[in-house]
């Protein structure tokens, strides 16, 4: 009898289209999951929430000043340390790659590797974003202007940030991660945030370098990217991305996504968080899961299940989350028998 796949092997088989024994899962239903999702710590805020002239403000470790008026935990950025990108050589990055912030990850991986069924260890890079990481410290409008007014300075800063990300990749490889994960939202609701030509000029060379480096170190590359991104999926796959994590699909269409990159890019997705999970019935959720597997998961793998990490914020009920989990488990071998 053929030995049962470990969770680690199952995830690798799914994302490389090598016929896993079932779809891998990362679900909040208390049953067996296949991924150990490892987030790192980081430096404290430069200044915690405090009242200043009637406003609640804080300054994060990147030097961004945030304001909140309603008592929320996030607030809105109101001041950026690199509003003028021509001053970027004076900017000092936070100490995100300090080994102390990886200690918990190292210990979890050691413990995981002792298991008879080790999970796939997915490490989130402390420097996990090139696009968002840049506009977070510049301000989005300032970054949009810099593409045209200060392209050389913008490229130089992105290169510095990419070098920090490469350090994160090496540390996570040394810790024993199977994959590394980044975050770059490239889409608005119905179109890309910027043109493909700008992404190709400013970001693809850096992605290619860092993703190739991760592959050389024996790891897969995962990236969260929401919004209307389907027009970029094949490009990202050719550049070296293995898995894209998307919380919405219906703004693009499952069949359109599959036609664009099915079989060359794997997908880590819940049921669409904006439409079916909000306005659909239990039966709609079941049908959507089945359809997702019959499209994105039909390539000897290619799909991993998950649930949205902040369900209360988007109005997902306990009943609908349970229905989604049940459907993913029910159809986990669909197309793989």
Task: Describe the residue ranges of each PLM region.
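Active-site loop segments of alpha/beta catalytic cores
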Residues: 1-30, 59, 93-337
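Helix-coil boundary/capping segments in enzymes
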Residues: 33-108
């Amino acid at each position: 009898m053929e030995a049962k796949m470990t969770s680690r092997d199952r995830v690798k088989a799914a994302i490389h289209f090598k016929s896993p024994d079932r779809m891998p899962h990362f679900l909040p239903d208390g049953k067996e999951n296949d991924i150990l999702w490892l987030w790192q710590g980081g430096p404290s805020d430069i200044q915690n929430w405090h009242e200043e002239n009637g406003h609640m403000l804080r300054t994060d470790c990147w030097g961004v000043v945030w304001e909140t008026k309603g008592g929320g935990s996030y607030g809105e950025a109101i001041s950026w340390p690199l509003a003028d990108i021509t001053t970027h050589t004076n900017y000092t990055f936070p100490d995100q790659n300090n080994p102390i912030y990886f200690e918990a990850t190292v210990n979890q991986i050691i413990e995981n590797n002792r298991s008879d069924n080790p999970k796939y260890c997915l490490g989130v890079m402390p420097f996990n974003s090139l696009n968002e990481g840049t506009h977070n410290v510049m301000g989005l409008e300032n970054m949009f202007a810099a593409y045209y007014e200060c392209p050389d300075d913008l490229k130089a800063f992105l290169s510095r940030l990419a070098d920090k990300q490469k350090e994160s990749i090496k540390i996570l490889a040394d810790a024993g991660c199977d994959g590394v994960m980044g975050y770059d939202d490239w889409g608005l609701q119905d179109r890309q945030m910027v043109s493909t030509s700008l992404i190709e000029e400013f970001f693809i060379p850096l992605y290619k370098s860092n993703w190739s480096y991760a592959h050389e170190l024996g790891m897969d590359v995962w990236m969260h990217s929401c919004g209307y991104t389907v027009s970029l999926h094949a490009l990202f796959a050719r550049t070296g991305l293995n898995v894209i994590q998307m919380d919405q699909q219906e703004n693009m269409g499952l069949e359109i996504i599959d036609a664009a990159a099915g079989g060359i890019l794997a997908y880590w997705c819940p049921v669409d968080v904006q439409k079916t999970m909000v306005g659909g019935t239990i039966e709609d959720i079941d049908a959507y899961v089945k359809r997702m597997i019959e499209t994105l998961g039909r390539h000897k793998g290619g799909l991993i299940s998950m649930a949205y990490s902040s369900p209360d914020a988007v109005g997902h009920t306990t009943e609908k989350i349970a229905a989604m989990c049940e459907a993913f488990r029910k159809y986990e071998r669909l197309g793989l028998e």
